From Swiss-Prot:
The keyword Cytoplasm applies. The keyword Cytoplasm applies. Pfam families: Sacchrp_dh_C (PF16653), Sacchrp_dh_NADP (PF03435). GO terms for cellular component: cytoplasm; cytosol. It catalyses: L-saccharopine + NADP(+) + H2O = (S)-2-amino-6-oxohexanoate + L-glutamate + NADPH + H(+). This is Saccharopine dehydrogenase [NADP(+), L-glutamate-forming]. It comes from the Eukaryota. Homodimer. InterPro entries: AASS, NAD(P)-bd_dom_sf, Sacchrp_dh-like_C, Sacchrp_dh_NADP-bd. Its EC number is 1.5.1.10. NADP(+) binds at residues 9-12, 32-34, 54-55, 75, 97-98, 124-126, 174. Belongs to the saccharopine dehydrogenase family.
């Protein structure tokens, strides 16, 4: 009887739990810091039990891991290496949806020696994106073709009808991580040249990206795309860019917040949680160093530190800042620094309301040179909506692949020990097939150029 330990009870974990509970032989233990939370989480789910576990207690964590065949780690990625060490020590397996970081990668030799399978990067991005990238690249190479360009963009967004705020974005989890990602620098290949973009300039590089006529997407690059030349075995590719999709208007608004200093984590006494809560207009004035907190002075200062594209852009962004309350007398929720204080307001105003749904869009676009020297464009596209008052698209598309990979480890389909991620068709093929049965697949299209 396979035994599974599920660490975490976030929104992604429930689709994982539901998928694995379909197999009657699986015994699933859900661990949370408080027993009541774990019990509420498994309510109505067969063959599951709840335990209280503090993952900061390494001895208790190791004991729990050692008592199960496989541990699913859906807690913050900083804990994954600790979970993997405990599993490897006892010859057990692990599954995560996170990128393999250096601390995880260095456990490769120990995992192989112990016969432990530590599967990672099996959500949507990373995860489903890898599956179809590997599939397409292998198909092209087997046919004697070359990948000349690889573009991959993904966005978790509100459905168009629910994108009703100045950012066209909503938070289903902490806004802090979303905003911090906007400060990351980017590195990619474009037309054979290495391009590097500083984090502060990232939003300026955003440009329209066409997938379907009904959606106004913009794209910008993510972190280091250059590593995928080797990982995906496409040394011939002159352009390799992985990036993020947002609705139009998002980058300009974020760029203004960056210029104003609201993505800054520097502690400020006047934003201390112990200090009296100041009105928003006073905080805005202090952060941007305006002459006063009057709306006229705030707008004057913002106009001097941020270059608006045109008058329409200026009007839209200033209206957005007003919508957030940044020129108002409403007290802020002080969280120590400008970034976290802004996050408190974003999380208050930009949550999904009851009955609203999210959307996930993912597309790979390959420019291919065939064996015969002809050009073709290949696309793999996923457009998925959440269910109002049910699973979000993001939860399903991260949680179900994690559940599928877990089951394939237990069934012996994934059977190579080590620290793994989807890197070849031996791993990717069965995952693609099983996910398709769950209704999770990318639509593939080939357009031959004359």
């Amino acid at each position: 009887m396979p035994s599974i330990l599920l660490l975490g009870s976030g929104f992604v974990a429930h689709p994982t739990l539901e998928y694995l509970s379909r197999r009657k032989e699986n015994n699933i233990t859900v661990a949370c810091r408080t027993l009541s939370k774990a019990e509420a989480f498994i309510n109505g789910i067969p063959n599951s039990k709840a335990i209280a576990l503090d993952v900061n207690d390494e001895a208790a964590l190791e004991k729990a891991v050692s008592e199960h065949d496989l541990t699913i780690s859906l807690i913050p990625y900083t804990y994954h290496a600790t979970v993997m060490k405990a599993a490897i020590k006892h010859g057990k397996h692990v599954c995560t949806t996170s990128y393999v970081n250096p601390k995880m990668a260095e456990l490769e030799e120990a995992a192989i020696k112990a016969g432990s399978i530590c599967m990672n990067e099996i959500g949507v991005d990373p995860g489903i994106d890898h599956l179809y990238a590997i599939k397409t690249i292998e198909e092209v190479h087997k046919a004697g073709g070359k990948i000349k360009s690889f573009l991959s963009y993904c966005g978790g967004l509100p459905a168009p009808e629910d994108s009703n705020n100045p950012l066209g974005y909503k938070f289903s989890w902490s806004s802090r991580g979303v905003l911090l990602a906007l400060r990351n620098s980017a590195k990619f290949y474009e037309n054979g040249k290495l391009v590097e973009i500083d984090g502060k300039d990232l939003m300026e590089t955003a440009k329209p990206y066409f997938i379907y006529p009904g959606y106004a997407f913009v794209c910008y690059p993510n972190r280091d795309s250059t590593v995928y030349q080797e990982r995906y075995q496409i040394p011939e590719a002159e352009t390799i860019i992985r990036g993020t999709l947002r609705y139009q208007g998002f980058p300009e608004f974020i760029h203004c917040l960056v210029d104003m200093g609201f993505l800054d984590e520097t502690a400020q006494e006047y934003l201390s949680p112990e200090a009296p809560a100041l009105p928003w207009k006073e905080v805005t004035a202090r952060v941007i160093k305006a002459e006063s907190s009057s709306e006229a002075d705030l707008i004057k200062k913002i106009s001097s530190i941020h270059k608006f594209k045109d008058e329409d852009d200026k009007k839209r962004i200033l209206n957005g800042l007003k919508w957030l309350g940044m020129f108002s007398s409403k007290p802020v929720t002080p969280r120590g620094n400008p970034l976290d204080t802004l996050c408190a307001t974003l999380e208050e105003l930009m949550q999904y309301e009851e009955g609203e749904r999210d959307m996930l869009i993912l597309q790979h676009k390959f420019e291919v040179e065939t064996k015969e020297g002809k050009r073709q464009t290949r696309t793999c596209t996923l457009l998925d909506y959440g269910v109002p008052n049910g699973y979000t698209s993001m939860a399903k598309l991260v949680g179900v692949p994690c559940g599928v990979a877990t089951q394939q480890i237990l069934d012996g389909v994934i059977n190579t020990p080590g620290v793994l991620a989807p890197n070849d068709m031996k791993l990717c093929g069965p995952l693609i097939d099983t996910l398709a049965k769950e209704g999770i697949r990318l639509e593939e299209e080939i357009i031959d150029e004359e």
